[in-house]
Amino acid sequence: MGVSQIWEFLKPYLQDSRIPLRKFVIDFNKSQKRAPRIAIDAYGWLFECGFIQNIDISARSRSRSRSPTRSPRDSDIDSSQEYYGSRSYTTTGKAVINFISRLKELLSLNVEFLLVFDGVMKPSFKRKFNHEQNATTCDDEKEYYSSWEQHVKNHEVYGNCKGLLAPSDPEFISLVRKLLDLMNISYVIACGEGEAQCVWLQVSGAVDFILSNDSDTLVFGGEKILKNYSKFYDDFGPSSITSHSPSRHHDSKESFVTVIDLPKINKVAGKKFDRLSLLFFSVLLGADYNRGVKGLGKNKSLQLAQCEDPNFSMEFYDIFKDFNLEDLTSESLRKSRYRLFQKRLYLYCKDHSVELFGRNYPVLLNQGSFEGWPSTVAIMHYFHPIVQPYFDEEVLSDKYINMAGNGHYRNLNFNELKYFLQSLNLPQISSFDKWFHDSMHEMFLLREFLSIDESDNIGKGNMRITEEKIMNIDGGKFQIPCFKIRYTTFLPNIPISSQSPLKRSNSPSRSKSPTRRQMDIMEHPNSLWLPKYLIPQSHPLVIQYYETQQLIQKEKEKKGKKSNKSRLPQKNNLDEFLRKHTSPIKSIGKVGESRKEILEPVRKRLFVDTDEDTSLEEIPAPTRLTTVDEHSDNDDDSLIFVDEITNSQSVLDSSPGKRIRDLTQDEQVDVWKDVIEISPIKKSRTTNAEKNPPESGLKSRSSITINARLQGTKMLPPNLTAPRLEREHSSVLDQLVTDAQDTVDRFVACDSDSSSTIE
């Protein structure tokens, strides 16, 4: 996996380089007007997907703590152990699902990609790195030069390295390649290291970026790298997909990449991270092929690699830049120059320790320091890696589905692909048919959508745009406008998804018609969000969508112009509603009003003859209902009780004596208020006594008796009291009292006549 410290030193220049994969594709399409083309380090992908795991940790732990964590393919185990040992790799269904998921994401965005596998000419010393013996020997030197000779001959005869291919591939490699063949995805088998071949493709212009976590891609001369393809917001460096760190911010829906543009970084950093500096830094610190120079850590190694006067990186490059198989003397000369360079570097560090490192390091400069330099063969693999000298561009032709702008995906044998995947017993899939249907359609939905034109009658109804929205990623840091594409099955020989679309119910209880969204789901049960910028605005379905939205907006505006019934706001709670039996939306001011007509007072007096004069009687005040039932009918003949409203208490409720006392307190009696009225009988007797003074003893006794009873009482004139009582308090009882008074008066008169006769 190269030197991880390189990523550490580049991190300050990569602050805003961690972006979603979809944004990277969109930005590239905007700037270049085409899809990006990416070379993928296949072994790195297989490691991250989980094909290679259960590594012998004890062997790796023997390396220095500062040494980077290496890929399983670069571990200490030999080829058979790495590929065939039960502890070094796996072909579990989970790894296959992860691999297919990555392929699906690239294909769904219409990205062009090319998988690059390691070849049989991969340096053998990488597999023997952690052996106790020296990593590179004379045998390695012979192997390197013989491999180069055989490599050149094979390309002259066959045009490739097929003559050097191993008789059989490891199991998981065979499985992956068979899957790629069934899906018609092209790939490249490099002659040597896959990273070196990826760099060759990028430098030659065949691809735009390299997708890899291996820093060796920079050492080989790569300039544009996509690093740490994962579902993490933050760039934590390369790791296996099986690792679980609680500190990592995980996003299960979106994939991110870290975009590294080395020329832009060097413009800011002053060319401190060019290829020569990074290569010399890797040699000093230690990489896949050596343990590093003793006594130098990452900071001291970086100081020496970036030193400009003297420029040790350029001197180191001059030693290994030339390569000639026919001139064997050049190799011995190279070794001699290499030893002199090591000695010169040691002496310079000893003399300028404070200037270079800020202090004097006696331990560093002791005898025995600066040991552990790699062999010339190991360094030659970085300066002159074994790659294909003549690249076959057929793998980039549009007959493969991993190249954009072709419709060959319709010709895939989906039945054979389905049976192959079913034989792997993929885990965590509840419905294989649905998973297979959705995965295949999501891979090629964008291509199928872009292939639609007017002659297709707008996709023959297979798909349509139903919604649009802005996808917020990383808390709104990235916003990607997307269209929601609803579609039906459009690939041949693929069973329809088991997800049944919504159907309109025939139940009589259903009163509402389906909504527009429900109708869309019934017609197109599957959906996928695609970035708007990957779809041209002139596309027929895009035009149809915006026309439909305009019609919907006009309908809403028409409905909004219709005047709705104005309703008064509720001004009371439901207590008033329960008490008055009225709706709360009605006007509160009308709640207490009665809908019954006010009854007129009864003008006919009860128990009085019709011929009697009632001119002196008061007409009672109008009566009003005391209890009105709003739910009663107007034609109801039931008895209605009313209250008679009078100005004062009726005289019917008191005796004549009490009535006299009450009358004295009445405010309406304003004549002689201090005079207490007497009964008519007493009044009559008093009058007669005044007219006829007693002359005899009987008459005197009668007069004394009357006077004694009326002592201290002032009498009113008889001609004023009686009419006043009749006028002001004329009622039934008053009439009876008047009749009684007349009767008493007659008896008094008779009594007076009898007294006169006796006398």
Swiss-Prot record:
Modified residues (Phosphoserine): S730, S731
GO process annotations (BP): DNA damage response; DNA repair; replication fork processing
An example molecular function term from Gene Ontology annotations: 5'-flap endonuclease activity
Location of the protein in the cell: Cytoplasm; Nucleus
SMART domains given in the database record: XPGI, XPGN
Effect of L528D: Mutants show a growth defect after treatment with DNA-damaging agent MMS
SUPFAM superfamilies: 5' to 3' exonuclease, C-terminal subdomain, PIN domain-like
Phenotype when changing I97E: Mutants show a slight growth defect after treatment with DNA-damaging agent MMS
InterPro entries tied to this protein: 5-3_exonuclease_C_sf (IPR036279), PIN-like_dom_sf (IPR029060), XPG-I_dom (IPR006086), XPG/Rad2 (IPR006084), XPG_DNA_repair_N (IPR006085), Yen1_H3TH (IPR037316)
Keywords for this protein: Cytoplasm, DNA damage, DNA repair, Endonuclease, Hydrolase, Nuclease, Nucleus, Phosphoprotein
Feature: compositional bias, Low complexity: 500-512
UniProt xrefs under Pfam families: XPG_I
Miscellaneous comment text of the record: Present with 131 molecules/cell in log phase SD medium.
Role description: Endonuclease which resolves Holliday junctions by the introduction of symmetrically related cuts across the junction point, to produce nicked duplex products in which the nicks can be readily ligated. Four-way DNA intermediates, also known as Holliday junctions, are formed during homologous recombination and DNA repair, and their resolution is necessary for proper chromosome segregation. Involved in DNA-damage repair in vegetative cells.
Protein name (database record): Holliday junction resolvase YEN1
